Design a protein with these regions (language model features):
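Transmembrane alpha-helical segments of multi-pass membrane proteins
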Residues: 19-23, 78-94
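Transmembrane alpha-helical segments of multi-pass membrane transport proteins and ion-pumping complexes
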Residues: 29-33, 60-65, 89, 93, ...
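Generic hydrophobic-segment detector
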Residues: 15, 23, 116-120
Length: 141
């Protein structure tokens, strides 16, 4: 028998994943801002307007949220973290491909995109560790 939405078991991992994704975006913006000052360059050198970066971050965030939701209860975070790094990096490149090829090359070599991807992998590991620790404490109490 099929259960209704109100009868289904709650999935706190999805909500935790959403909060972690929002936190990831905030940290990426902060770190990229510091990197821009340190490197004395803009995160996006090309004149693409404001929509590329917003669209790329939304898509990368959705990718990260889905990965976090799916990997937060896995046995270990390694493949989830590797997947997050790769898929967030690729999402920036694929969205850049909608604009033009020079932007793809620029983003592929960008320390800002690499930072976002590495921080996505770190977010997967941190979420996995946090949920695992919470479940371990609940099972003991």
């Amino acid at each position: 028998p099929r259960r209704s939405m109100s009868e289904q078991a709650p999935r706190p991992e999805r909500l935790v994943a959403l909060f972690v994704t929002v936190f990831w975006a905030a940290v990426v913006f902060a770190v990229d801002g510091l990197l821009a000052v340190i490197l004395d360059r803009d995160p996006i050198q090309s004149d693409v307007g404001p929509y590329y970066s917003v669209f790329a971050f939304v898509i990368a965030g959705l990718v990260l949220w889905m990965l976090l939701s799916g990997t937060s209860t896995s046995r270990h975070p390694v493949w989830g973290a590797v997947g997050a790094v790769a898929l967030v990096y690729l999402s920036f490149l694929l969205i850049a491909a909608l604009w033009d090829l020079p932007l793809v090359v620029e983003q592929a070599l960008s320390p800002f995109v690499l930072t976002a991807a590495v921080l996505a992998g770190a977010a997967v590991v941190a979420t996995w560790a946090g949920i695992r620790s919470l479940r371990w404490r609940r099972s003991r109490g």
